[in-house]
Amino acid sequence: MSLELEWMPIEDLKLPSNVIEIIKKRGIKKLNPPQTEAVKKGLLEGNRLLLTSPTGSGKTLIAEMGIISFLLKNGGKAIYVTPLRALTNEKYLTFKDWELIGFKVAMTSGDYDTDDAWLKNYDIIITTYEKLDSLWRHRPEWLNEVNYFVLDELHYLNDPERGPVVESVTIRAKRRNLLALSATISNYKQIAKWLGAEPVATNWRPVPLIEGVIYPERKKKEYNVIFKDNTTKKVHGDDAIIAYTLDSLSKNGQVLVFRNSRKMAESTALKIANYMNFVSLDENALSEILKQLDDIEEGGSDEKELLKSLISKGVAYHHAGLSKALRDLIEEGFRQRKIKVIVATPTLAAGVNLPARTVIIGDIYRFNKKIAGYYDEIPIMEYKQMSGRAGRPGFDQIGESIVVVRDKEDVDRVFKKYVLSDVEPIESKLGSERAFYTFLLGILSAEGNLSEKQLENFAYESLLAKQLVDVYFDRAIRWLLEHSFIKEEGNTFALTNFGKRVADLYINPFTADIIRKGLEGHKASCELAYLHLLAFTPDGPLVSVGRNEEEELIELLEDLDCELLIEEPYEEDEYSLYINALKVALIMKDWMDEVDEDTILSKYNIGSGDLRNMVETMDWLTYSAYHLSRELKLNEHADKLRILNLRVRDGIKEELLELVQISGVGRKRARLLYNNGIKELGDVVMNPDKVKNLLGQKLGEKVVQEAARLLNRFH
């Protein structure tokens, strides 16, 4: 697993001088050991490689060299695939450098019902696994020109949610030239063989990692730390996290603390903030961040106020409940070393590149959602992802990763399980009906008609054991035929019109089946019923429902004005999802009725990030339901769902639909205009002074011009 530490001078690369110049401009004079090894294994000759190495070991530059050398020799296009939108943006900014030598770089994510024909003009495309999967289903011609794929963060194959789509994309991508990049994985030889690639495996890190465990001593407020090399040290403080955080800050380090829930992340951040008076902070830099925070429109007032009080002390929390703009601000403040401590949930470890001198893992247990009162230990991969964030190149000589345990008895076990063990082997996540049926539907959509043998061969190319493929394959074909997603044409299987629409919309076949049954069995219904139906599907958003809240929702069910489109289920799990869907529907109803965002957040106990994600998912599902109802010729439903989709997208009452077509006019500005007598596009054009008065000179002028352009287009 370890490599001889060889550093290759940039000048020794068999690459044109203009390519070498771009790399040099970044201050890189030599390739590090993983990069050197990749070049020695034929990266620049287009050899298929699987590179596994820790976070921060320079994998992106390996991808850049692979793509650029391949395109210079062979022409065509290359696609770089990441599991997260935040990473897509990060990689796009890096790859923009190559426009200096004539390559056109583009980024695409979201909006699954399109073939993105505009990408035919680009050479290097950065996207997500889901987006690429959806593009293949639409069969755009430009995709045939792509002959080099970089599959980033391939260890996401093991992710229960994202794994199936990563595997689906990999099965198709491995039929062409590829470079796969991953965090350290234990069965890398097996995965390399599956990819038809040569493994390049290394544990090299730019900053050495020191791992340890902290536990309480008998003496009050004293904590002992044992490191992997058996050295020890003592720290003092009100609890283990505070003690080690203050110790690291006293050495001018930054600290990333991981907690297992949002509540814990927020309360720990508040606790740490109380001790920051002893830490030297750049108050001017922090007040600059606070000014930027005031300018951010997204986010609830309460979360902004809490963040303000924390950031003023050099601390912040970070989790998916925060809006993207707030998360971005916190990340940038930390990168610039203005914010000293971030307390986050583990999602941060899997996402953007945000190293710190010290990582403190506050919990190795996580609440089990399926069994009340039961806690699971976190996977080893999650521990490695979190600890891998320790040590910032260019700032830190070492990185420290410390796990908090309750007592001395836990120390040995935690060392053996997390510090000294390999991560779990990667296994297929296509082994469920939901994942496997979606996979087959996607293959037929991308490939066109296939014989049973051809379709089966695609399934055999997965990581799933052959016996399991046989079981799922027969079951899937039977179900997809019975539910009219596919049909037999001679000796081949083909998608029905309905099946093709489902594949193009990029929704799960079980979601489509629930929507179809709900619509076909009922006349046009109320908004809440449609929202509830869509939230109840496998693709619907999940939201946390407290016990008291659940009782209130059950009572509310009995008093609804209109009939829901799904019968109450008997099974406990299904019933729980049914209640969850009702909460989502109520949130969306308030959003569409223009209830103030702060009110929604406090009423339903959610974060602004949750609301944004919910709106995005329900926008996609209402759009999909509208198109399915048209396909099924359910015109009454289609009319209702079209309006519902537009209202969900912008969070508006129906009367504002015309105004929000204007770029720069969202729910608040549209309501302001409407309440002041500007109700249609024509009113905007006819009353320019009034519009400028309401929206400000600069924006008002733009809005009037845009309204005039829209009017001309319509007439």
UniProtKB/Swiss-Prot annotation:
- What protein name applies here? ATP-dependent DNA helicase Hel308
Q: Pfam families, from UniProt?
A: DEAD (PF00270), Helicase_C (PF00271), Helicase_dom4_arc (PF21280)
Which consequence is recorded for altering residue 59 to A? No helicase activity. Wild-type binding to ss and dsDNA
Q: Where is the Helicase ATP-binding domain?
A: 40-203
Q: What class of enzyme is it?
A: isomerase
Q: Per its database record, what is this protein's job?
A: DNA-dependent ATPase and 3'-5' DNA helicase that may be involved in repair of stalled replication forks. A low processivity 3'-5' helicase. Unwinds short dsDNA substrates with 3'-overhangs (25 bp dsDNA with 25 base overhang), less active on longer dsDNA substrates. Also unwinds the lagging strand of a stalled replication fork (but the leading strand was not tested). Binds ssDNA, but dsDNA about 35-fold less well.
Q: Name one GO biological process term.
A: DNA repair
Give the gene symbol. hel308
Could you confirm whether the keyword ATP-binding appears in this record? yes
| Statement: the UniProt record of this protein carries the keyword Nucleotide-binding | yes
Which CDD domains does the UniProt entry name for this protein?
A: DEXHc_archSki2, SF2_C_Ski2
